[in-house]
Curated annotation (Swiss-Prot):
Keywords: Cell membrane, Membrane, Transmembrane, Transmembrane helix. Its main location: membrane. The chain crosses the membrane at residues 42-62, 64-84. The lineage of its organism: Bacteria, Bacillati, Bacillota, Bacilli, Bacillales. GO terms for cellular component: plasma membrane. This is Uncharacterized protein YpbF. It is found in: Cell membrane. It comes from the Bacteria. It comes from Bacillus subtilis (strain 168). It is a multi-pass membrane protein. Disulfide bonds: none annotated. It holds the Pfam family DUF2663.
Amino acid sequence: MESLWNQLDQFTDAPTKQMLQALVKRKQKFENYAAQCRRWRWASLICLGLLCVMIMIKSPEPQLILQEILSHTFYLFWMLATAFAYCTSYYFKKKEEKSETDFHKLRCEIIQKSTDLWPQPDKWKARESVFHMMKHKYDINLYFESK
């Protein structure tokens, strides 16, 4: 990856290179939070499903489900685990949304300042190659501001 950034020296100056590196870091941070959120959502869904299945299997009658839940601490522990998994997924969802807005703001800033970062006649072709590399290597679209 470092050699890729060294190749950018011929196309960009140092501040632009730092902006692009920060953009890649923010994208990775956003993707990490999104993966964590998905992981905890699945964990909470599995915990809830297993809790429901265990209650339905162990409960002798449908009228006694509440009594069954309150009489065994195992069910209470399982409900706490489900609630913890859900709250953790909610936490990571908020972090994901914040990191997505940070990433999108920096991406839009680079797009808006592209005429300043790459002056028109001499480095405009370099801009195109940098945008192409960012699109194909990191899946970051610098052509348009829309998400």
